[in-house]
A protein has these predicted regions:
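Periplasmic peptidoglycan-binding/tethering modules of Gram-negative envelope proteins
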Residues: 1-66
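Periplasmic OmpA-like peptidoglycan-binding domain that tethers envelope proteins to the cell wall
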Residues: 28, 34-52, 56, 73-151
Length: 151
C-alpha cells in the first residue's frame, strides 16, 4: 500500500510531488488546485485530491501510529482581508482545512495530526533573484500545502 504513494503521482497531477525524506514522506500539493485565490476553502478538485491521499495514508498512519503534519505555505504577496489579515492566517487556515478533511469520517486520527501555517517564511523557490527581479514560477511553487508523514 505504501508503494502506491510513489507510483508516479505526477502522471495524474503535475501539482503533486512525493519525496522520501529523512524525517518521513513529504507530499507537496500545489495550492492552485486546492484553493481559490485568497481562499482557504477546498475546491471540488482539492477535496478530491485530499480524499485520494487520505484513502492511501489512513491505514499507514493508523496502523504504524505515525504522526502527520500539514503545512500551509503562501507566496510573498500580502493579503489583507477581514478573514485573513495576513498570510499567516491564510496559511494556517488552509492547513487546518486540509487536516479537517483528512480526519473527518474516521480518516487520519486527529490525535496524530497537526496543522501548521508558515505564510511566506519557507519559500520553495526564492521569489526574487539577486537583482530583485521576480523569479518566474516562484510564486506558484511557493503556494503549496505539504503533508509530512513522520516515521
Amino acid at each position: 500500500r505504501l508503494d502506491s504513494i510513489y507510483d508516479n503521482p505526477e502522471d495524474d497531477d503535475p501539482d503533486v510531488e512525493v519525496e522520501l525524506m529523512k524525517r518521513g514522506i513529504n507530499i507537496t500539493l500545489g495550492s492552485n488546485d486546492l484553493f481559490g485565490s485568497g481562499s482557504a476553502t477546498l475546491s471540488r478538485k482539492g477535496r478530491g485530491i485530499v480524499e485520494e491521499i487520505t484513502a492511501t495514508l489512513t491505514d499507514i498512519v493508523s496502523d504504524y501510529h505515525l504522526t502527520m503534519d500539514v503545512e500551509g505555505h503562501t507566496d510573498d504577496v500580502p493579503i489583507r482581508s477581514f478573514r485573513f489579515p495576513s498570510n499567516w492566517e491564510l496559511s494556517a487556515s488552509r492547513a487546518a482545512n486540509v487536516v479537517r478533511k483528512m480526519t473527518e469520517s474516521g480518516g487520519i486520527p486527529k490525535e496524530q495530526s497537526r496543522a501548521i501555517g508558515f505564510a511566506d517564511m519557507r519559500p520553495k523557490i526564492e521569489p526574487r533573484d539577486s537583482t530583485g527581479a521576480l523569479v518566474r514560477g516562484a510564486r506558484d511553487a511557493n503556494r503549496r500545502v505539504e503533508i509530512i508523514i513522520h516515521y
